[in-house]
Amino acid sequence: MQKRLSGKCKICKQPYIKQKATQQVCSVECAVKWSAEQSRKKREKLDKQARAESKKRLSALKEENKTKGQLIKEVQEAVNRYIRVRDENKECISCGTPLISEKLGGGFDAGHYRSRGAAPHLRFYTLNIHGQCKRCNRHLGGNYHEYRVGLIERLGIKKVEEIEADQRQRHYSNDDLRRIKRIFNKKTRLIQRKRG
């Protein structure tokens, strides 16, 4: 003789004897309510998937329609973030002040030896960019002469002269800019993970 299974109704929470092993509710009225509930949950799930897919399509479309200027700005932000993480707890390239990171506004800047205006082709070149205190970078116009002295100490005179003589044009496509941004974001995350 087969033992009858007992269950608890999913709708009214009353105990009942199951007629089938897959039975979920105790009566026809509860079955109608349970069916409506399941339909509602299925609709909500499909709506959520549709919204997620729509959001993904919209963000891809926004990324695709960015202008070159917007992409350059985003890449510059990624490069500067990398420089700040790389040079954290080092000394300012110009004056030797310790570079301590601050949460609000950042404790120091990513200063360019050859400025972005004078040498836009070197704006993403990491040997041209070093951690610099805000005083030197903003208030002393980059403190160029001291920056050069600090750069010679770090890289050597030959490399500094190569940077000064570099006039090669670099023309970046939108895909190149997106790739550069991904690379620098990845480098930043790697350094942050190593530091913990």
Which ranges hold each PLM region?
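Histidine-centered nuclease catalytic patch
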Residues: 93-129
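Short cysteine/histidine-rich metal-coordination sites, predominantly Zn2+-binding motifs
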Residues: 25-30, 43-49, 108-118, 148-156
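Amphipathic alpha-helical interface surfaces
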Residues: 79, 88-91, 106-109, 125-132, ...
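Short Cys/His-rich "knuckle" micro-motifs
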Residues: 18-23, 34-39, 102-113, 143-146
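Ligand/cofactor pocket segment of small-molecule handling proteins
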Residues: 66-94, 98
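Short Cys/His-centered divalent metal-binding micro-motifs
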Residues: 30-35, 97-100, 128-155
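A boundary/linker detector
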Residues: 1-78, 170-196
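Short, surface-exposed acidic
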Residues: 155-165
